[in-house]
């Protein structure tokens, strides 16, 4: 779809307006606006230092939970593996759906990034949403959604008539860019630059004279 906002609207059409949608508070305001514009009832759930507060989550009326496990906006919180398991257990106990909004996760500073909820899910309760607007360019307006198998037939029946909002040529170019390894190399360069930027901001200028900038900003393919 043409960006994540378009996909948020499809989520409501797919899952229904008769559900309560739980959202992070504070969170990305446009998510609430899109859900509300599509007729969904939103329940704001307070954040702790590791995601949505556990007590608030246990009392929630929501049957759909929209979460941003990595760098939640505006708090910047990244949920732990234990919290991600808690979300999955919550969904399993209520037969609920999790919307994993994984924006910005490509830029994790951990050598071994945390697993996505979608990859941890064994019950088919996670819808994965991401976009290329940060990793490539905002002007591309390309987002994507990965559905669990149990929702695929429902999607085909209720929303399968929609034409894709991203031009076929753009999709083809991006597919080639990914399949030939350029996207991964591009991300590696961005991560190195991000690491250097963080490093330089936290080191005195006198210490930087010993650092090889040529290595950090290498123009090679890796």
Where are these regions (language model features)?
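Conserved Walker B
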Residues: 102-104
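Conserved glycine-rich beta-strand-loop-beta hairpin in the small C-terminal domain of fold type I
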Residues: 191-197, 208-222
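Active-site PLP attachment segment
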Residues: 118-154, 169
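Structural signature of PLP-dependent enzymes
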Residues: 156-162, 180-197
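Hydrophobic residues in beta-strands of the RecA-like P-loop NTPase core, especially within AAA+ ATPase
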Residues: 23, 99-100
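Conserved core of the PLP fold type I
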Residues: 1-94, 106-107, 114-120, 124, ...
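Domain-scale detector for complete catalytic domains at protein termini or as standalone homologs
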Residues: 35, 57, 126, 140, ...
């Amino acid at each position: 779809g043409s960006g994540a906002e378009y996909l948020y609207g499809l989520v409501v059409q797919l899952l229904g307006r008769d559900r309560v949608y739980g959202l992070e508070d504070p969170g990305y305001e446009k998510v609430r606006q899109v859900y509300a514009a599509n007729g969904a009832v939103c329940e704001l759930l307070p954040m702790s230092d590791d995601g949505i507060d556990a007590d608030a989550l246990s009392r929630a009326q929501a049957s759909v939970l929209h979460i941003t496990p990595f760098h939640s906006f505006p708090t910047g919180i990244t949920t732990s593996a234990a919290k991600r398991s808690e979300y999955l257990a919550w969904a399993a106990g209520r037969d609920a759906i999790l919307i994993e909004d994984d924006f910005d996760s490509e830029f994790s500073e951990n050598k071994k990034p945390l697993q996505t909820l979608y990859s941890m899910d064994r019950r088919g309760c996670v819808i994965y949403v991401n976009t290329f607007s940060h990793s490539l360019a905002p002007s591309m307006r390309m987002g994507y959604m990965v559905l669990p198998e149990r929702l695929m037939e429902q999607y085909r029946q209720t929303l399968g008539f929609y034409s894709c909002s991203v031009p076929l040529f753009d999709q083809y170019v991006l597919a080639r860019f990914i399949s030939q390894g350029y996207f991964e190399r591009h991300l590696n360069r961005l991560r190195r630059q991000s690491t250097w930027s963080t490093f330089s901001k936290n080191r005195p200028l006198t210490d930087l004279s010993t650092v090889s900038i040529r290595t950090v900003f290498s123009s090679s393919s890796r």
